[in-house]
């Protein structure tokens, strides 16, 4: 089955057909690195990491690029407040970003370009827009001529007239039209700046992504993604800049994830109700936060509260328990049982259902429902008097398959004392029955979990390894 995805540009689901067969060029707007990331920043990182995983699962060669905005007004303000320079602050929070999203199971992009490392490409892009008549210089600033680009407003589905009615020129701005936006900003006293044909300054926010997409992925890409709040003006302006320069369709598909609400109220730094990722993962398993995010379709809003996270924890633990039980059941399984094919067929049905869910606009919520149903079937199977090891392994393999796409590792939980004693008793029984193969298998399993056994005249003793 082919993938269908919801394209913000057309406001409908479309069959995914990449520009080049078998290959996907994907760009995701990354964070402005002036502080630790909050859960709103984490959502696109998790969502689009999962999208990449599934595209690769389907056999696509994905070139995934996600940027860092390492210079802008917020960073300059943060650096001034901390008494540090902008590069020091941005480097600190880039490192923190990788630590946080890494804990959440996100792989690094193929490239993480930074604005300060791509100033030449940005200046060249702006210069070309001026030459083509789409931009103009005004007292050291450079602005994009919004009205010169006929397609402006197509992503956010707003007309120029609608936009004009609410546009104003602020005091100090040197643009010709209220709808024009800055490509380059003249330097202010004491601010970090770069030499340019228009004097010292720094780039506007929107031009950064256009320039880096062109440099690292080319004139046209398959997927451009980010948070819903970036649709306008950021992504709208990216389209205008890039398509004005190249005359080509900038991005074929636009994906946008929904907002996060805190206790039913929109998360906002101005309201002070934001939650930092590095605070949450001190209290909870980082995988739980990822599971929580993926339990809702990426385009829908998420309501976050610790109460909801606790409920999600209970659900997540049910999957982990089923996975743990499957691994333990391998010890006592036989080679063949009477109805193996029936159970294997059920597992295959769940593979199909999982792929159907993900093919439908990357519906991780439905995919997780399939996972729970698979766990339910596995639990039924383990109630059988006899289980076949190849069927158990097929269940485990399907758990792993789903987990690898969703970026979730159920793993083996640390055994509690009662479980260890139970396994030791099974081993003792195997030894009494002279089933030394099973005895060794249990010993090796415990050893892999860092449980050390010592057989003495008084019985088997155990301890946890250092």
Curated annotation (Swiss-Prot):
It is an enzyme of class 6 (ligase). The modification Phosphoserine is found at residue 270. Keywords: Aminoacyl-tRNA synthetase, ATP-binding, Cytoplasm, Ligase, Metal-binding, Nucleotide-binding, Phosphoprotein, Protein biosynthesis, Zinc. One of its GO terms (biological process) is cysteinyl-tRNA aminoacylation. It catalyses: tRNA(Cys) + L-cysteine + ATP = L-cysteinyl-tRNA(Cys) + AMP + diphosphate. Its cofactor is Zn(2+). Pfam families: DALR_2 (PF09190), tRNA-synt_1e (PF01406). It is found in: Cytoplasm. GO terms for molecular function: ATP binding; cysteine-tRNA ligase activity; zinc ion binding. A motif ('HIGH' region) lies at residues 31-41. Its EC number is 6.1.1.16. A motif ('KMSKS' region) lies at residues 266-270. InterPro entries: Cys-tRNA-ligase, Cys-tRNA-synt_Ia_DALR, Cys-tRNA/MSH_ligase, Rossmann-like_a/b/a_fold, tRNA-synt_1_cat_dom, tRNAsynth_Ia_anticodon-bd. CDD domains: CysRS_core. Zn(2+) binds at residues 29, 209, 234, 238. One of its GO terms (cellular component) is cytosol. Binds 1 zinc ion per subunit. ATP binds at residue 269. It comes from the Bacteria. Belongs to the class-I aminoacyl-tRNA synthetase family. PANTHER family: CYSTEINE--TRNA LIGASE, CYTOPLASMIC, CYSTEINYL-TRNA SYNTHETASE. Monomer. This is Cysteine--tRNA ligase. The gene is cysS.
């Amino acid at each position: 089955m082919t993938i269908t995805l919801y394209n913000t540009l057309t406001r409908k689901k479309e069959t995914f057909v990449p520009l080049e067969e078998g290959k996907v060029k994907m760009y995701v707007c990354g964070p402005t690195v002036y502080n630790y990331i909050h859960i709103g920043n984490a959502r696109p990182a998790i969502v689009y990491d999962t999208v990449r995983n599934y595209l690769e699962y389907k056999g696509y060669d994905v070139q995934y690029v996600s940027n860092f905005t390492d210079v802008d007004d917020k960073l300059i303000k943060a650096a001034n407040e901390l008494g540090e320079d902008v590069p020091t602050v941005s480097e600190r929070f880039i490192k923190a970003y990788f630590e946080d999203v890494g804990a959440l199971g996100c792989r690094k992009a193929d490239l993480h370009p930074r604005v300060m490392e791509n100033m030449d490409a940005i200046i060249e892009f702006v210069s070309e827009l001026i030459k083509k008549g789409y931009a103009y210089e005004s007292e050291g600033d450079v602005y994009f001529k919004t009205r010169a680009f006929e397609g402006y407003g197509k992503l956010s589905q707003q007309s120029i007239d609608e936009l004009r009615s609410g546009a104003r020129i602020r005091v100090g701005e040197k643009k010709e039209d209220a709808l024009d936006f800055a490509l380059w900003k003249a330097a202010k006293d004491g601010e970090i700046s770069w030499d340019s044909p228009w004097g010292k300054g720094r780039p506007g926010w929107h031009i950064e992504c256009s320039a880096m997409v062109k440099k690292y992925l080319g004139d046209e890409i398959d997927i451009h993604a980010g948070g819903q709040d970036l649709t306008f003006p950021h992504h709208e302006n990216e389209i205008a800049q890039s398509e004005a320069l190249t005359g080509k369709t900038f991005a074929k598909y636009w994906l946008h994830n929904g907002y996060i609400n805190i206790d039913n109220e929109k998360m906002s730094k101005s309201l002070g109700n934001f939650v930092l990722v590095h605070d949450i993962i001190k209290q909870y398993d980082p995988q739980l936060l990822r599971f929580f995010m993926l339990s809702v379709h990426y385009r829908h809003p998420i309501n976050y509260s610790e109460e909801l996270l606790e409920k999600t924890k209970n659900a997540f633990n049910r999957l982990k328990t089923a996975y743990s039980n499957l691994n333990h059941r391998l010890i006592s399984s036989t080679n063949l049982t009477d109805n193996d094919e029936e159970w294997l067929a059920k597992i295959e049905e769940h593979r199909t259902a999982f792929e159907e869910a993900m093919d439908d606009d990357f519906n991780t919520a439905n995919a997780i429902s399939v996972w729970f149903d698979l766990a339910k079937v596995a639990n039924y199977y383990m109630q059988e008097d006899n289980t076949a090891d190849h069927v158990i392994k097929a269940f485990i393999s399907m758990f792993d398959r789903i987990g690898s796409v969703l970026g979730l590792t159920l793993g083996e939980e640390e055994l509690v004392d009662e479980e260890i004693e139970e396994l030791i008793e099974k081993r003792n029984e195997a030894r009494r029955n002279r089933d030394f193969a099973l005895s060794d298998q249990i010993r090796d399993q415990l050893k892999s979990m860092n449980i050390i056994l010592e057989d003495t005249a008084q019985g088997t003793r155990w301890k946890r390894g250092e």
